[in-house]
């Protein structure tokens, strides 16, 4: 497997309110499902199409390639093929993404980011506070069908790196501590919500691999998220005998700050030491990718007003993280951008560090270090 240096194209085909709040202003909703419920169908479709046409363009793929990256992770929804109204399908934009990627020498990891009734209850799962997809066999089958159709449509494209089976199926500890848990708008809809059990996930991954691999050659990679349980997979992958697979983990240092509120480099190093011990253990049986990470941290953000000191601190933390990821099979920065206008101020200073394009512009990240 090539060493991945990549970025995520989040909030393009799967919306996340915090990244572009103006899309949600007229409805005061928190996720894409409720946005679709509050707007008239035609108005919703027009809003989505305008966003997709303008949020990511060919120019972005050129920019990504010119900054020494070789892969993009592209989150796609369960309604990709336009068969779950009122949601708007997105194969038109995925097709464009492949054309642009191949033009600029990039590859794409297609990432199934949402499923009906959600796998995590996050806004990025499409329905905040609801998480019981795994309890619906018909919707589990639907997700498998989406994966198979993605493999059929894109499996032979030279720009395809691989397909990720499912983003962030939630574990018990993460579900119990997630801010979104218990925040569903419709409490009836949220009944039965809970974490995704590991036995179910192992079975789903086995079935998904078979469905994808039928249509995708072994030169393409099937990627599995660790479900926030990085060390739970060794025996499974050792016995599964899959070909060309990788495990995806999402080691965000900002998440550690919620539990250890000491924003100092030595604390981040200690946290990453623990993360890397888990990754090394997992890599005895499967390559591991840091599929989402960023340099967001309070150590740098708290001195944002001092541009020189702030930049120095972000570079310091970036080096710590990038040094760690060199031991992995590669990484994808979350996210490529937040606001389309890179000169427009974000409503919170910390959001700047989630935006790769701004990190490069601000000198917080240097492509020579990738």
Please identify what each model-predicted range represents.
Residues 305-320, 324-370:
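Aromatic-rich peripheral "rim/lid" segments of glycoside hydrolase catalytic domains that contact
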Residues 80-83, 116-126, 172-175, 297-300:
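Short acidic/His/Gly/Ser-rich catalytic and metal-binding motifs that mark active-site loops
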